[in-house]
Amino acid sequence: MEETPRSVGEASTTNFVAARPSAKTDDAVTMRGCGFANLALVGIDKEELRGRLAMPEYLRIAMRDCIKRKDSTEISDHLLLPGGAAADMAPHAPMVVFINPKSGGRHGPVLKERLQQLMTEEQVFDLTEVKPHEFVRYGLGCLDTLAAKGDECARECREKIRIMVAGGDGTVGWVLGCLGELHKDGKSHIPPVGVIPLGTGNDLSRSFSWGGSFPFAWRSAMKRTLHRATLGSIARLDSWKIVVSMPSGEVVDPPYSLKPTIEETALDQALDADGDVPPKAKSYEGVFYNYFSIGMDAQVAYGFHHLRNEKPYLAQGPVTNKIIYSSYSCTQGWFCTPCVNNPALRGLRNIMKIHIKKANCSEWEEIHVPKSVRSIVVLNLYNYGSGRHPWGNLRPKYLEKRGFVEAHCDDGLIEIFGLKQGWHASFVMAEIISAKHIAQAAAIRFELRGGDWKNAFLQMDGEPWKQPMKSDYSTFVEIKKVPFQSLMINGE
């Protein structure tokens, strides 16, 4: 399972498949976002753009009222079939924007004002005031109610509406998760989502060609961004459900994205486990779009998050954050402490077994955990850690030798790779070498069992937590593909 040098390849694109962007494509998007191509934007007229995006006023008011009342079934009579309704035409590309004012530093409030100028006030939602699930349930529900009563304009807006999210990867995932409820309810016409990057890593934004950072010349760039959002093709994105099952009675402080199940569950007693399978288990479940990891990288992230929460004055910007993060990596032993000095710092195979299901296979298969690996990452996107590509662009001969296929974010497979000591991780993140390729899988089951380790450190899409372990009972982490795919707008 040797590392392999990277090979450079051009990405292919289609109207419906999210292909891996090449470095050239990503750089071009970043240049556009930073205003280098703004001379080409002169032809985008502000009023013409507004006409393509803005829904009729009566629909905007009806949606606003339904969201405020949290009821999409009762709509004021004067909004049902207003005078002249036949003359109201649906815009070419009805759109709403969710903005996280806590992202992007000082840009949040002024960006909200700028978007309201380009669209309408009612079509820009502040996430501190209107949550995504409220819009999905009551805003889209309002359009469904009006359409069911014969309002053709409402029906067309509901079918064509697109969503832009101004925030980081966590905010985008939040919106995608709420839209997933439409799939569960059997609804059609799921709105696709585009991104205005306001976060730190912005890997979802990079993966769909929306750039890796908030544009420098942002006021003029917003016209171009919204225009691209009206024209962009639709791509698909896999998402993955994670279930963490531990012995009943264990106490864990999970991240926001991981929710406890209502009832205790009984685990399959036929599981091939090193430790005993508890008769009853407490379970938490959630969904991730980018990555899940176990090991030293999660431990460093956990310590950094706690330090930042306890002493926020230390983390005043991205440069300071990176310095603190690097220092914390060293004090935790990833760089500066030999792996053999402390049992708690040894390879993950001392506490872990991994089983996978390959594509079109119903049987679990155990895979080898390399002894040198101190972090294991399960990656869905091509981009990781602010645009790095740890899986790499692998040559066809290597793919054939390992039994791999070229990785895509919509192929129903997920990549598993390992990071060794901190220096190895640094070379991987610098894209000098690829990570330790372990497997591609359609489903994964981790078994964690204590001993010298009392806790394991896990993280999901950047949210870390400390997972208690027992030596007599196993803790299981199971990852399976969500049966439906999210829809994304390509920014190219």
UniProtKB/Swiss-Prot annotation:
**What lineage, starting at the top, does this entry show?**
Eukaryota, Viridiplantae, Streptophyta, Embryophyta, Tracheophyta
So what family is this one in? Belongs to the eukaryotic diacylglycerol kinase family.
Q: What does the entry say about activity and pH? A: Optimum pH is 6.8.
**Record's keyword annotation contains Ligase:** no
Expressed in which tissues:
Highly expressed in flowers, and at low levels in roots, stems and leaves.
Please provide the record's keywords in A-Z order.
Answer: ATP-binding, Kinase, Nucleotide-binding, Plant defense, Stress response, Transferase
Q: What is this protein called?
A: Diacylglycerol kinase 7
Q: Name one GO molecular function term.
A: ATP binding
Q: Which proteins does it associate with, and in what oligomeric form?
A: Monomer.
Write out the GO biological process terms: defense response; leaf development; phospholipase C-activating G protein-coupled receptor signaling pathway; root development
EC number(s)? 2.7.1.107
**Which Pfam families has this protein been placed in?**
DAGK_acc, DAGK_cat
State what this protein does. Phosphorylates the second messenger diacylglycerol (DAG) to generate phosphatidic acid (PA), another important signaling molecule. PA is required for plant development and responses to abiotic stress and pathogen attack. May be involved in the accumulation of PA during cold stress xhibits high specificity for 1,2-dioleoyl-sn-glycerol (1,2-DOG), 1-palmitoyl, 2-oleoyl-sn-glycerol (1,2 POG), 1-stearoyl, 2-linoleoyl-sn-glycerol (1,2-SLG) and 1-oleoyl, 2-palmitoyl-sn-glycerol (1,2-OPG).
> What PANTHER family would the database entry show?
DIACYLGLYCEROL KINASE, DIACYLGLYCEROL KINASE 7
Q: Where is the DAGKc domain?
A: 90-248
Q: Which Gene3D superfamilies match?
A: 2.60.200.40, Probable inorganic polyphosphate/atp-NAD kinase, domain 1
| Catalytic activity line of the entry | a 1,2-diacyl-sn-glycerol + ATP = a 1,2-diacyl-sn-glycero-3-phosphate + ADP + H(+)
SMART domains reported for this sequence: DAGKa, DAGKc
